[in-house]
Amino acid sequence: MAKFSTQNNLRGLAKFVRQNRGRLLIGYLSYDLAYELHGLRTSLPANQQLPQIYFLAFDTWRQITQQEILTANLPTTPGTQNFKPKLTLPQYQKIFRQIQTYLRMGEIYQINFTHPLTGATDLSARTLFAKILAVNPIPNALYLEGENFEILSFSPESFLKIQNNQIETRPIKGTAARTAIPAKDLSLKKSLQESPKEKAELNMITDLLRNDLNQVCRPGSVQLTAARLFQKCPQVWHTYSRITGTLATSPLAALLKMFPGGSVTGCPKKRALEIIEELESQRRGLYTGAIGQIDPQGNLDFRIAIRTIIKKQTRLSLQVGSGIVIDSTAEAEFAETLQKAKPFLQALA
């Protein structure tokens, strides 16, 4: 196994990827790389003290089922743990009013504002991963062990998938809570489907991602193949679009050019990044970066690093957010962020 760990050595990453062609690479890019990639400065404190770029290269691996993970790692006795948001609703409302000012001035049309939750546990990271997977059994969950940290990612959002020179992105925008009562669950889905606000939000981000794809694809190859689809997660409904194209550059170059994802920044992207830097209380670290794999053939599959826990010793960090537009309300957006954290809170209860 080979390892690449650095703060911002993008040339070193490209060399590592080339040298390990034919192996399976698994790793992540921290959101904080956006400062270098987009020429921004930050005065925000780091929140996780992780490498900004971290990859492992494997010669051998095997596939296992989620049931194998649960059987091997679910605890026979409960552990002690807790999770709570750092931001209160009144504090969120104050920041929300500042965002609305930027929206009314036309500086941005949509922004993804996020806030952290912190916790602690005496459970091992593998046990915690299994507990969350039991209540949130999504495909493509990812567990990664670093030198002094573990990552537990349950992201539902595909950022970039590149196979045989074909590229696809599936930005998520639009969220509704789910319930165990079938009739009410369908009613919540219908409300999401009919919401002008949620439709507009997805359209904005779809246009942004389509423009981003045009920068890395052959002219005329970018297509919106699905304008609005539904994704059913255990705790929430999401809507997403699907955009495809034919790659005109290397997979890694495309990943870096489009980084970070438009669905977790806003539009226009550069100004949204600047306002995020102004209003959020700490650097995002891995959160809303990209996490995934490069297969032995050079195909790439990365997800947006949302619904992702960082564990360092007994300390846990999680971040949640939502897209805010001119007709959003602070109360609804704050509730949406906590709804997204529900699987983690439920697993840690």
Describe the role of every protein-language-model region.
Residues 1-349:
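Extended alpha-helical targeting/anchoring segments
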